[in-house]
C-alpha cells in the first residue's frame, strides 16, 4: 500500500510539473510577442511592459503588465483557459489598484491570452469587455474591439 501511495505521489508531482511547464511556455510566448512590437494594444501605445509582477499588498501575480502615463493593460495568460477563469481576470483591475496605488486613477484594460480558445469562452470575454489574445499559427491575434476600461 505504501508503495502504491508513493507511486501515486510521483505521478502527481510529474503531472504538476508538466502543467507548470506548459504555463511558463504560454507566459513566455505571449510576453515575447508583446515585447517585440505588440505594445499598441487597447488602442493605446504602452511604453513599459513587465512580466510576472508580484503584488505588494496581496499574493497576487500579474502575468503581463503594460504601462503608459494614463493606462494599464493587464493580461492573464493561461496555456488552456476555461470560462471559470473569467472572474479572476475581472478581479484584477481592483487588485492591481490595491497593490499599486499610484495607478489608482489610470484606466485599466484587461486581456486573456491562451493557446486554446473555444467559441463560448470568446463570447464570454466579449460580453465582459475582456480582450481575446490567442495564437494563430505563428502569429498572435488580438480581438479588442469590444473592450471596456475598468
Region locations from a protein language model:
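Amphipathic, low-proline, heptad-repeat alpha-helices and/or compositionally biased low-complexity charged/polar-rich
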Residues: 1-36
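Arginine/glycine-rich "motif VI" loop of SF2 helicases in the C-terminal RecA-like domain
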Residues: 95-105
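Structural signal for conserved beta-strand scaffold positions within catalytic alpha/beta enzyme cores
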Residues: 48-51, 76, 112, 134
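Short helix-loop-beta junction
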Residues: 36-42
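Conserved catalytic cores of phosphodiester-cleaving nucleases, focusing on short active-site segments
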Residues: 34, 62-85, 89-90, 94
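Domain-level recognition of nuclease-like catalytic cores that cleave nucleotide substrates
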Residues: 109-150
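Active-site metal-binding core of divalent-cation-utilizing nuclease and nuclease-like domains
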Residues: 43-69
Amino acid at each position: 500500500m505504501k508503495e502504491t501511495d508513493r507511486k501515486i505521489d510521483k505521478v502527481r508531482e510529474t503531472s504538476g510539473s508538466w502543467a507548470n511547464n506548459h504555463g511558463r511556455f504560454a507566459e513566455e510566448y505571449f510576453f515575447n510577442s508583446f515585447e517585440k512590437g505588440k505594445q499598441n494594444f487597447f488602442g493605446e501605445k504602452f511604453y513599459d511592459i513587465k512580466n510576472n509582477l508580484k503584488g505588494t499588498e496581496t499574493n497576487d501575480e500579474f502575468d503581463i503588465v503594460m504601462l503608459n502615463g494614463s493606462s494599464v493593460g493587464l493580461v492573464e495568460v493561461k496555456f488552456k483557459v476555461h470560462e471559470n477563469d473569467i472572474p479572476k481576470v475581472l478581479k484584477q483591475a481592483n487588485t492591481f489598484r490595491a497593490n499599486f496605488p499610484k495607478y489608482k486613477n489610470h484606466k485599466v484594460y484587461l486581456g486573456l491570452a491562451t493557446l486554446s480558445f473555444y467559441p463560448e469562452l470568446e463570447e464570454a470575454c466579449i460580453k465582459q469587455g475582456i480582450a481575446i489574445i490567442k495564437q494563430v499559427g505563428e502569429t498572435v491575434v488580438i480581438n479588442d474591439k469590444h473592450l471596456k476600461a475598468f
